[in-house]
Amino acid sequence: MNENLDPTNQKYNPEELDLEKKLRPLSFDDFTGQEQVLENLKIFVQAANLRGEALDHTLFHGPPGLGKTTLANILANELGVGIKITSGPVLDKPGDLAGLLTNLDERDVLFIDEIHRLSPIVEEYLYSAMEDFKIDIMIESGPNARSVQINLSPFTLVGATTRSGLLTAPMRARFGIQSRLQYYNAELLTTIVQRSSSILKMPITMEAAIEIAGRSRGTPRIANAMLRRVRDFAQIKGNGSIDIEIAKFALNALHVDAHGLDEMDNKILNTIIDKFKGGPVGLSTLATAVSESSETIEEVYEPFLIQEGFIMRTPRGREVTEKAYKHLGKVKANVQGGLF
């Protein structure tokens, strides 16, 4: 995937990060889509505010780019509390976590992205903090080492993961609120593109907004990234506004087709067809064949390809569908058994 459009890419330059934050909704009213999740969260937040309690620990899971981080920030805003943000891979030692927990004020939100990547020792350390709002820390070392219990202010842990199946059962059980975010339809993404273009003060036609939305893989983060790139083309190659012609020109230049598939998506499909006769093929073998990590294929590319019906998982591996053959203009070879 073009790194400018990759929903997992964390290597944006400072200007891109600022723009991404600028486009993020700050309240429930500004957030588009995920209606059932949103309605439930509104009730949970109102009830917590009414009782003056910390919101129950909350887990958001689903493909990248659908709004998990945005919703964590919205929860803090709607609760009227502070938020501290970190990620699973960053928390190497219990001491890293202790520093965050002891600096939380009452009812604050601690957001841990990629929570499935917490180390086992840090995860176990988190259990007592989540359940009892207490942690035990070791003072000194050697024969003088002793454990001291520290009381924490009641807080809300918000976890986000793209791979909920990797969460341990004890960790999952400690989240009182669990919400799965779904891919967006084109209509909702069109609304998001129009809202973002308004914030960016970039005029856009309805046709162009629909075109960008239709190629955004059902993902708001990709829709906003595409909009920013199309805006670049509009300012340099166009007349400073986004119409259907400049939108198509820009998206084609970015190698994003009408289905939202990019070079790597099509490479995956072509590889399964050309090298493995349509499949089945194992994930690690496929990853080697396309020079991409298994994790990236499984987290970034595969969910959308399955959602859109281009590939399917079977007990023996990945297989392409008839839709993939039609999309690529290929004819499925007839494979017959027997000796003759």
From Swiss-Prot:
Region annotated Large ATPase domain (RuvB-L), chain positions: 1-184
UniProt cross-references to Pfam families, sorted A to Z: AAA_lid_4, RuvB_C, RuvB_N
Major place of residence: cytoplasm
Record: residues binding DNA: R313, R318
Transmembrane segments: none
Positions that bind Mg(2+): T69
Organism domain of life: Bacteria
Keyword Nucleotide-binding in annotation: yes
Reactions performed catalytically: ATP + H2O = ADP + phosphate + H(+)
Gene Ontology MF term list: ATP binding; ATP hydrolysis activity; four-way junction DNA binding; four-way junction helicase activity
Annotated binding of ATP, by residue: L23, R24, G65, K68, T69, T70, E131, D132, F133, R174, Y184, R221
Location of region: Head domain (RuvB-H): 258-340
EC number(s) on file: 3.6.4.-
Keywords for this protein: ATP-binding, Cytoplasm, DNA damage, DNA recombination, DNA repair, DNA-binding, Hydrolase, Nucleotide-binding
SMART domains linked to this entry: AAA (SM00382)
EC main group: hydrolase
Single GO cellular component term: Holliday junction resolvase complex
DNA damage found in the keyword field: yes
Subunit structure: Homohexamer. Forms an RuvA(8)-RuvB(12)-Holliday junction (HJ) complex. HJ DNA is sandwiched between 2 RuvA tetramers; dsDNA enters through RuvA and exits via RuvB. An RuvB hexamer assembles on each DNA strand where it exits the tetramer. Each RuvB hexamer is contacted by two RuvA subunits (via domain III) on 2 adjacent RuvB subunits; this complex drives branch migration. In the full resolvosome a probable DNA-RuvA(4)-RuvB(12)-RuvC(2) complex forms which resolves the HJ.
Homology family: Belongs to the RuvB family.
Protein name as it appears in the record: Holliday junction branch migration complex subunit RuvB
Organism from which the protein derives: Flavobacterium psychrophilum (strain ATCC 49511 / DSM 21280 / CIP 103535 / JIP02/86)
Gene: ruvB
